[in-house]
Amino acid sequence: VTAAAKTPSGSIFAGSSDREDVDVYQDGEKTTIRVEDPTDAMIAVPVSGGEDSVYRINRRTTIIQNINVADKSAGAVLRVGLGVGTITPGAQGMALATDTIGKQFGVYLTNDVIRLHQTTPTTGAPWAIAWDDKRQQVWVATTDDNKIRRYQLGSGQGEELEAYNSIENTQSLVALPDGMILAASATGTDVQVITP
């Protein structure tokens, strides 16, 4: 298992980078869902008053796919630009995905089927991405120029609000409930704290 996600209802979804299936563990039972490509990363996103969303990505084929939680089946597949990097949960079933090669990030939603809601170009090559629930904004770390940028999502595409210098090779980014941003390097022991 290389990727797993737990829904608020307690179901566990698990995938592997060398198998074309996703295992679902619920109420002591295991169900296996067949998918077209292996899984590199997976997230679960809660939805108030609705069915939780589960998304997975495959970097080789640069795709994102939703997994239907209720009937435990594979959902639709969309391409993520030129080279998907990472995904992170957003608000109300939203998934955010970076397109590292295409220098953009996408906002995905799923009700009955996955949809690309909008894309936003980034100045550098994005890898890590985080949803700031306090501000309802997106934070993106770009590894080619060592910056962390904050975006406001708009009706068409996101707007860059500000940029911070970051530690080298930021590949992990987290927005805490109080609005503090934590960034971690993949090549060292450095951790950066941003308090906007």
Please name every model-derived segment.
Residues 23-26, 66-68, 108-112, 142, ...:
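Structural recognition of the beta-propeller blade-terminating site
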Residues 168-196:
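Blade-level signature of beta-propeller repeat domains, shared across WD40, Kelch, NHL, RCC1
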Residues 1, 27-35, 71-79, 113-120, ...:
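A short beta-strand motif characteristic of beta-propeller blades
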Residues 59-113:
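Aromatic-anchored, glycine/proline-accented short structural segments
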Residues 94-167:
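Intrinsically disordered, low-complexity segments enriched in Gly and acidic/Ser/Thr residues
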Residues 1-9, 35-48, 82-92, 124-132, ...:
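Repeated scaffold domains used in trafficking and secretory/extracellular systems
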Residues 20-23, 62-64, 103-105, 146-148, ...:
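Structural signal for beta-propeller blades
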Residues 6-8, 13-18, 47-60, 95-101, ...:
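Conserved beta-strand positions in repeat-built beta-propeller and related beta-rich domains
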